[in-house]
């Protein structure tokens, strides 16, 4: 059983005409769910709002105050990328709570995995600042809640952009392993190979900054030689995935070269990092070509429940990035030694 979250509240966040992070993205997600061939396995999950206390585990109270105040007066501009409307606080609180609802449902044994079609996305939001289309850090809110119960959490982020907010929030936490595969150089400018965490969390952050044109075979090597060995040593209780479909070769904002077939393979590999069924939650982050989002969702969902995907785009190969994987493998194998 795959739990899939959707909610009308997400439509209430409107950053304005021409903004790439638009409501139509969720229509593409819904089309991908319909095309996945999992009609009999998908169970709707009703999200709930994250409370101020739950947001407060990762965000300063002032951040939530700003989002709520701007929404209450009909909207406003945080920065050139991050624009709010009257419904933005409600959408963001519901998006941040979707992962909490998913974790609660999975802990009750109600599903094998969960896919959360939420917006606004979250991984750029820092502890104190909304940015990069993101208001609250959805994956971080869920990880922090799981941590209160003593769980060790692995966050795998394969959005094309580095999740600077998630990295910052868990920078010194040894019980949250944050792994990001992203395009470099690209917004927001963080995520270098030598950014590995600090204090007690040194070694619990792993970045693989890949060049434009990187293909699925490079990602598979990264999982084989870096991500899986790291996760195996870390032994997570939960795996949370920041899944941006903007690494697809058709995406208008980025230069990576993945296909829908590659996204299916990535979801399968991410699920295999978890200790067993019912411990994987996938959060929608970026992805701005609607056809690519639809096709990538259709390939992702079967992988989360161990089903073969419908025939679609083949996995890709032949792009650059092996040198980055080589360097990361050398760095992290030295860490193991």
Residue ranges and their predicted role:
Residues 48-72:
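Charged, often glycine-rich, active-site loop that binds/positions anionic groups
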Residues 1-56:
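N-terminal low-complexity, Ser/Thr- and acidic-residue-enriched intrinsically disordered segments
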Residues 1-5, 11, 65-337:
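A general "terminal functional-core" signal
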């Amino acid at each position: 059983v795959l739990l899939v979250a959707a909610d009308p509240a997400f439509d209430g966040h409107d950053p304005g005409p021409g903004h790439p992070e638009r409501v139509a993205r969720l229509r593409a997600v819904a089309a991908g769910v319909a095309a996945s061939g999992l009609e009999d396995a998908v169970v709707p999950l009703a999200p709930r709002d994250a409370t101020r206390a739950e947001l407060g585990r990762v965000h300063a109270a002032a951040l939530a105050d700003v989002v709520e105040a701007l929404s209450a007066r009909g909207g406003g501009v945080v920065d050139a990328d991050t624009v709010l409307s009257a419904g933005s606080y409600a959408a963001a609180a519901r998006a941040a709570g979707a992962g909490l609802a998913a974790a609660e449902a999975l802990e009750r044994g109600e599903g094998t995995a969960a896919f959360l079609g939420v917006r606004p996305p979250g991984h750029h939001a820092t502890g104190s600042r909304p940015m990069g289309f993101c208001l609250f850090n959805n994956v971080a809110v869920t990880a922090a809640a799981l941590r209160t119960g003593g769980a060790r959490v692995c966050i795998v982020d394969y959005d094309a952009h580095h999740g600077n907010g998630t990295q910052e929030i868990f920078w010194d936490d040894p019980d949250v392993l944050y792994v990001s595969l992203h395009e470099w150089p690209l917004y927001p400018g963080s995520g270098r190979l030598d950014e590995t965490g600090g204090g007690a969390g040194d070694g619990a952050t792993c970045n693989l900054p890949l060049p434009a044109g990187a293909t699925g075979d490079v990602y598979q090597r990264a999982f084989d030689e870096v991500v899986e060995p790291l996760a195996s040593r870390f032994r997570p209780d939960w795996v949370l995935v920041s899944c941006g479909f903007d690494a697809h070769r058709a995406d208008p904002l980025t230069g990576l070269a993945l296909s829908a077939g590659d996204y299916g393979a990535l979801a399968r590999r991410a699920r295999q990092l978890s200790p067993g069924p019912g411990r994987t939650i996938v959060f929608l982050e970026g992805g701005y070509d609607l056809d690519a989002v639809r096709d990538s969702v259709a390939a992702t969902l079967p992988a989360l429940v161990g089903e073969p995907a419908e025939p679609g785009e083949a996995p890709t190969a032949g792009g650059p990035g092996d040198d980055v994987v080589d360097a990361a493998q050398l760095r992290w194998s030295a860490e193991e030694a």
